[in-house]
Every structure is written in C-alpha cells, then in structure tokens.
C-alpha cells in the first residue's frame, strides 16, 4: 500500500519536470518595463540573450534576476543600449559570454553586423534611433527603442519592408 502511494507521488514530480522543460525550451520574448527602463529577454530552446535600455548597477541586477528567474545562469549575449558610462561594467560581464556595450569599449552595432548565437540574432536596421531586427527561432521582432528609430527604419533601404509577419516592440510611448 505504501509503495503504491510513493509511486503515485512521483507522477506530479515528473509532470512538473516535463512542463518546466517545455517552458524552458520554447521561443519567446519576455519584456519587462520599469519606469523608462526596459529589459528584453529573448529565449530559444534553453538559450537566452538580453537587451537592456539602461546600463547602471540597478539595471544589471534586474537583468540578472530576470535571466535567473527564467532558468538562465549565463546568457549567450547582452546588448546594452545606454551610452552613459557607469560603474556596473563588472556586473554586466558576469551575465553573458559576450556583452555589447559602449561602456566596455565596444561600439554599438554597425549596419550589417549581428549579435548571433544559435537561434538568436540581433541586427541593426539603420543608424539613427537604433531600429533593430531580433530573430528568436522563427519569430521576427522589430525593435524601436526610440521614436527616431521608427522613422529611420521606414526610410532606410533595409528597413521595415514586408513586416507583416513581424511582431513590434516600442521602447517609448507613441504620441497621438
């Protein structure tokens, strides 16, 4: 009788492990906003990459909490968009294998360059405003961190042509 109950108790454990595995392996973009700061965690089959609009120590701690909450001890890459120098460089370096940040001496992405890891890619679409294309598996996201990014992408040759199957993220409140 006791052995039967022990075996039955294993069913919920196996079910929760299976559900956690399925959640961990799906493709998604987790978006967190706090005041004017944004964190975008791209997830693909257990891998992760992060984009942050802020570069200070608080932003890095928030990025760490976000990645750890979703099961990522270390991300493939991080893109920090804030050009203002802070004393949080060491924190950002511990988050990922590669950190693209002006504070760390790496210039922003240039046209034609990509941050890339298996199933995750970020590409700059135009210089002004930093409009970007984020690929998460088969998903395509157009990222517009600033108002200038939207108009810049509309006028660029690599811009938002055929964006009907793309999802869109705005890092600003559009004006009416």
Residue ranges and their predicted role:
Residues 1-176:
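Non-globular, low-confidence helical/coil segments that flank catalytic cores
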């Amino acid at each position: 009788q006791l052995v039967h109950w022990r075996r039955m108790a294993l069913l919920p454990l196996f079910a929760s492990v299976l559900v956690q595995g399925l959640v961990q392996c799906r493709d998604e973009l987790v978006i967190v906003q706090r005041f004017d700061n944004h964190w975008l965690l791209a997830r693909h089959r257990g891998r992760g990459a992060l984009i942050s609009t802020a570069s200070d120590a608080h932003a890095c701690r928030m990025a760490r909490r976000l990645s750890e909450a979703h099961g990522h001890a270390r991300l493939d890459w991080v893109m920090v968009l804030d050009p203002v120098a802070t004393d949080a460089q060491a924190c950002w370096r511990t988050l990922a294998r590669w950190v693209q940040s002006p504070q760390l001496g790496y210039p922003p992405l240039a046209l034609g360059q990509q941050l890339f890891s298996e199933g995750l890619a970020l590409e700059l679409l135009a210089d002004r405003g930093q409009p970007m294309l984020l690929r998460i598996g088969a998903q395509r996201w157009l990222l517009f961190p600033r108002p200038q990014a939207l108009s810049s992408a509309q006028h660029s040759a690599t811009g938002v042509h055929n964006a009907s199957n793309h999802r869109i993220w705005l890092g600003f409140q559009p004006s009416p």
